[in-house]
């Protein structure tokens, strides 16, 4: 089978009415799956359905009550949800429009042309165009293709992975990456103040200022998720339930719903909130805050009738030069014991990947003991 035939887009375009078994989710997951468009309509029509908090952070730039209220609203959302719709983010609409147009134009190219940027996970090369980032605990595949690469700092990026077509892709991605880096600093300041810490605390801990001689910048990884139409959205997912390893994740989309977050024991469909972007708290921030801020469990659903694209920027600490551990001030005066052992970001990613692989092996062993064959 060729790489082109392996792409989910090719499978979708083939007109299949059923999906291959490797995409069918385990039975215990299927009860609350469904078409993303239909679930979003149902959520919009139900006033009793829980709603992801919306916070306008432009008030943070002012003195007085508005600034304090902004800090408190972001803190509450990060503690109770681990996800926020951010308004007043300062990302110009024309830049976001150009970014969306460039991503859509890339995925509109023939698959064979996109293959020029293909990754090779087996060889340890995760960046580029592909269809799967890592092993899944379920052993199942996800209904998505993607483009993944470092977008900041620009001097560390492998620009051979940045599409030359459309021509707008490189300049708008570079512009967007720089702007999100500024936004990340602002949010980390707000989140620090929400914990009663100096506003530079969380960014300092993520960049390594507390280690002698270390002052690395945060890394921003851009992943464009492409979820083709799926004939059985009740059986498949675009991205399975997971938490992000990052400190923060910034998300925008093409207007097609699909994001769900787990809150208070239920899956909550993200509603359209015009003018906002979604921000997730990730594992790195949960570790630094000793669990005060929650790394949100989330997943991506698919639809029969619509193609969904989302642009996700993962804001990460340097992989090896920063030690992630709870901020000492949050443990002072008997406030609590550390919930997380110290680790570098690279070690955390490796531990999480190992756990996924072990979970998959355990699932396969259980299936084999029941007379089932798994691949």
From Swiss-Prot:
It is an enzyme of class 1 (oxidoreductase). Transmembrane segments: none annotated. 2-oxoglutarate binds at residue 308. One of its GO terms (molecular function) is metal ion binding. InterPro entries: DIOX_N, IPNS-like_FE2OG_OXY, IPNS-like_sf, Iron_ascorbate_oxido_reductase, Oxoglu/Fe-dep_dioxygenase_dom. Residues 218-317 form the Fe2OG dioxygenase domain. It catalyses: a (2R,3S,4S)-leucoanthocyanidin + 2-oxoglutarate + O2 = a 4-H-anthocyanidin with a 3-hydroxy group + succinate + CO2 + 2 H2O. It comes from the Eukaryota. One of its GO terms (biological process) is anthocyanin-containing compound biosynthetic process. The keyword Nucleus does not apply. Fe cation binds at residues 242, 244, 298. Pathway: Pigment biosynthesis; anthocyanin biosynthesis. Its EC number is 1.14.20.4. Binds 1 ascorbate molecule per subunit. Binds 1 Fe(2+) ion per subunit. Plants over-expressing ANS1 have increased accumulation of a mixture of flavonoids and anthocyanins, with a concomitant decrease in proanthocyanidins, and could represent an enhanced antioxidant potential. Keywords: Dioxygenase, Flavonoid biosynthesis, Iron, Metal-binding, Oxidoreductase, Vitamin C. Its cofactor is L-ascorbate; Fe(2+). It holds the Pfam family 2OG-FeII_Oxy. Involved in anthocyanin and protoanthocyanidin biosynthesis by catalyzing the oxidation of leucoanthocyanidins into anthocyanidins. Is able to synthesize anthocyanin pigments from leucoanthocyanidins in aleurone tissue. Converts dihydroquercetin to quercetin in vitro. Belongs to the iron/ascorbate-dependent oxidoreductase family. This is Leucoanthocyanidin dioxygenase 1. The gene is ANS1.
């Amino acid at each position: 089978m060729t790489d082109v035939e392996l792409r989910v887009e090719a499978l979708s375009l083939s007109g299949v009415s059923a999906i291959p078994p490797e995409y069918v989710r385990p039975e215990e997951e299927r009860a609350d799956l469904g078409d993303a468009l239909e679930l979003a309509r149902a959520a919009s029509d139900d006033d009793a359905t829980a709603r992801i908090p919306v916070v306008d952070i432009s008030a943070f730039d002012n003195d007085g009550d508005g600034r304090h209220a902004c800090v408190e609203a972001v803190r509450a959302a990060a503690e109770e949800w681990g996800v926020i719709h951010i308004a007043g983010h300062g990302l110009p609409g024309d830049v976001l429009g150009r970014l969306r147009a460039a991503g859509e134009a890339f995925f509109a190219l023939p698959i064979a042309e996109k293959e020029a940027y293909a990754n090779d996970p087996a060889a340890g090369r995760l960046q580029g165009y592909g269809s799967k980032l890592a092993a899944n605990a379920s052993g199942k595949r996800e209904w998505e293709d993607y483009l993944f690469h470092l977008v900041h700092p620009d001097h560390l990026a492998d620009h051979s992975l940045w599409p030359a077509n459309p021509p707008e892709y490189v300049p708008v991605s570079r512009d967007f990456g720089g702007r999100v880096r500024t936004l990340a600093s602002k949010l980390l300041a707000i989140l620090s103040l929400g914990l009663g810490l100096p506003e530079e605390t969380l960014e300092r801990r993520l960049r390594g200022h507390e280690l002698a001689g270390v002052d690395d910048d945060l890394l921003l990884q851009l992943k464009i998720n492409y979820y083709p139409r799926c004939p059985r959205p009740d059986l498949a997912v675009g991205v399975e339930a997971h938490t992000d390893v990052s400190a923060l994740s910034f998300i925008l989309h093409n207007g097609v719903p699909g994001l769900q977050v787990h809150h208070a024991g239920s899956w909550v469909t993200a509603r359209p909130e015009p003018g906002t972007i979604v921000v997730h708290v990730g594992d790195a921030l949960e570790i630094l805050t000793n669990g005060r801020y929650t790394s949100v469990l989330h997943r991506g659903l698919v639809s029969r009738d619509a193609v969904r694209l989302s642009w996700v920027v993962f804001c990460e600490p340097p992989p090896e030069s920063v030690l992630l551990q709870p901020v000492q001030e949050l443990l002072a005066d008997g406030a609590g014991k550390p919930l997380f052992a110290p680790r570098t970001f690279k070690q955390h990613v490796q531990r999480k990947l190992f756990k996924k692989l072990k979970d998959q092996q355990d699932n396969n062993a259980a299936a084999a003991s029941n007379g089932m064959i798994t691949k």
